[in-house]
């Protein structure tokens, strides 16, 4: 079963781009940079106009691991009637664009002999993996299990234990690339000069950034890790907003409806 995604609505949500920039900049600031680069930061993030192709493989109850994560956070576990988990095949070959700035450090003939401004553009990101998406207690958990072409899973119908919702193994991160392809273009030097100041394809820097993004996504989103989106925060904000509106307009009754449509 395949799904059509209203990608335009997602792409128009400015908070997604803002959160992506904040998250990646926080990670970049924590990196121990090699001696030939400094002051690296993200300057722009565009989700792109091309959506992933998603195929539903299985519907099941959420893994116990997700409930345990909620318990550790101190969240109360209510009824499970609306909790659900999907196993999906995600095929993404879109036009996401990431731009970064940095300074290339020349350490010859002496340390920090020269620093050149660098502009880096990351594009052509390709992902083709199996992914778990679980919705429980108004929270969404997303975790990538394996690359579709992984030979270790060629003869396995599902990475879920047939006797219950328990994932087989806890070291999937060791056998998943997740980002299968990535293109990095580098420009070095002042952008207003035209001769001899712009260098392209700086191999070491591009390889470093490629490894950074691949390792980051595997660390944060590949099983046994996951991305967690908490919609309870949005509900709390809506409640506070409604309370303020009722105080200013005591005779007005407000109602909010939420609906989500997926075309199979």
From Swiss-Prot:
It holds the Pfam family MMM1. The keyword Transmembrane does not apply. It comes from the Eukaryota. Residues 248-264 have a biased composition (Basic and acidic residues). It is a peripheral membrane protein. Its main location: mitochondrion. It is found in: Mitochondrion outer membrane; Endoplasmic reticulum membrane. Keywords: Endoplasmic reticulum, Lipid transport, Lipid-binding, Membrane, Mitochondrion, Mitochondrion outer membrane, Transport. HAMAP family: Mdm12 (MF_03104). Component of the ER-mitochondria encounter structure (ERMES) or MDM complex, composed of MMM1, MDM10, MDM12 and MDM34. A MMM1 homodimer associates with one molecule of MDM12 on each side in a pairwise head-to-tail manner, and the SMP-LTD domains of MMM1 and MDM12 generate a continuous hydrophobic tunnel for phospholipid trafficking. Component of the ERMES/MDM complex, which serves as a molecular tether to connect the endoplasmic reticulum (ER) and mitochondria. Components of this complex are involved in the control of mitochondrial shape and protein biogenesis, and function in nonvesicular lipid trafficking between the ER and mitochondria. MDM12 is required for the interaction of the ER-resident membrane protein MMM1 and the outer mitochondrial membrane-resident beta-barrel protein MDM10. Belongs to the MDM12 family. This is Mitochondrial distribution and morphology protein 12. The lineage of its organism: Eukaryota, Fungi, Dikarya, Ascomycota, Saccharomycotina.
């Amino acid at each position: 079963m395949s799904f059509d995604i209203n990608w335009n609505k997602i792409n128009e949500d400015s908070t997604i781009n803002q959160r992506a920039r904040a998250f990646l900049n926080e990670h970049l600031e924590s990196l121990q940079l090699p001696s030939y680069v400094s002051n690296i930061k993200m300057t722009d993030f565009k989700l792109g106009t091309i959506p992933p192709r998603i195929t539903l493989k299985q519907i099941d109850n959420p893994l116990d691991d997700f409930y345990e994560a909620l318990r550790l956070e101190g969240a109360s576990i209510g009824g499970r009637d609306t909790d659900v988990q999907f196993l999906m095949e995600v095929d993404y070959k879109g036009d996401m664009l990431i731009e970064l700035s940095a300074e290339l450090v020349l350490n010859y003939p002496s340390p920090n002999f020269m620093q050149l401004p660098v502009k880096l553009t990351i594009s052509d990101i390709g992902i083709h993996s199996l992914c778990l998406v679980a919705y429980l207690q108004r929270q969404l958990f997303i975790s990538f299990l394996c690359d579709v072409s992984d030979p270790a899973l060629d003869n396995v119908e599902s990475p879920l234990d047939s006797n219950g919702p328990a994932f087989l193994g806890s070291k999937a991160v060791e056998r998943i690339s997740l980002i299968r392809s990535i293109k990095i273009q580098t420009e070095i030097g002042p952008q207003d000069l035209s001769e001899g100041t712009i260098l392209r394809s700086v191999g070491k820097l591009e390889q470093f950034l490629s490894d950074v993004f691949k390792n980051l996504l595997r660390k944060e989103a590949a099983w046994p890790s996951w991305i967690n989106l908490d919609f309870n925060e949005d509900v709390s904000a809506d409640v506070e907003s409604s309370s303020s509106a009722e105080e200013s307009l005591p005779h007005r009754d407000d109602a909010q409806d939420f609906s989500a449509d997926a075309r199979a």
